[in-house]
């Protein structure tokens, strides 16, 4: 019965593939020290300028998808200062709200834990994102296999060592 409905399924939210675990994060950075910072689908970052703050949600292929800045008149009119800690906190709230409204629920933080702990602006920004409901961790990727997709034509088998491999160990 479920197969009848699955045949006519149209994904109207292409960004929902990350939520369902279908899209794998960017890979190929196994030998780099900061491979976790480069392997993401969405990344949230706070850009601090001299006279403003800007929060951005960056997709690994498309670049900036959603942003919120103290340059925007609607946000700037509600703030005492465009560069203080409360500005970073409110930019985090607005960005999280925009992300959730557009269907994006997971993102990786764009700064390291040390940088977040060192800066009050970063700390309040990421804390506001979490309080508003944006999860700062991406869901696990579902590996593409025959169990998850019956149209998959081959099955992975464990590789067994050859005679040459055994001779190399000696």
Curated annotation (Swiss-Prot):
Quote the SUPFAM superfamilies the UniProt record gives. Answer: Translational machinery components (SSF53137)
Q: This protein's superkingdom?
A: Eukaryota
Q: Which GO terms describe its cellular component?
A: mitochondrial large ribosomal subunit; mitochondrion
- A biological process (GO) annotation for this entry? translation
InterPro entries xref list: Ribosomal_uL18_bac/euk (IPR005484), Ribosomal_uS11_sf (IPR036967)
Give its localization: Mitochondrion
Q: Matching PANTHER family, A to Z?
A: 39S RIBOSOMAL PROTEIN L18, MITOCHONDRIAL (PTHR12899), LARGE RIBOSOMAL SUBUNIT PROTEIN UL18M (PTHR12899:SF3)
How this chain assembles, per its entry, is: Component of the mitochondrial ribosome large subunit (39S) which comprises a 16S rRNA and about 50 distinct proteins.
Q: What is this protein called?
A: Large ribosomal subunit protein uL18m
Which gene is annotated as encoding this protein in its UniProt record?
mrpl-18
């Amino acid at each position: 019965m479920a197969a009848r409905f699955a045949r006519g399924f149209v994904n109207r939210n292409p960004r929902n593939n990350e939520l369902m675990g279908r899209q794998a994060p960017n890979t190929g950075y196994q030998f780099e020290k900061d491979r976790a910072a480069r392997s993401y689908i969405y990344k949230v970052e706070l850009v601090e300028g001299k006279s403003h703050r800007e929060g951005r949600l960056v997709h690994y292929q498309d670049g900036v998808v959603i942003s919120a800045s103290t340059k925007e008149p609607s946000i700037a009119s509600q703030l005492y200062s465009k560069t203080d800690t409360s500005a970073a906190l409110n930019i985090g709230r607005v960005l999280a709200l925009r992300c959730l409204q557009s269907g994006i629920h997971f993102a990786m933080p764009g700064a390291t834990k040390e940088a977040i702990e060192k800066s009050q602006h970063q700390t309040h920004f990421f804390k506001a994102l979490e309080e508003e409901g944006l999860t700062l961790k991406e869901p696990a990727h579902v590996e593409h296999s025959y169990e998850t997709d019956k149209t998959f034509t081959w099955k992975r088998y464990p590789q067994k060592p050859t005679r040459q491999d055994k001779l190399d160990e000696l």
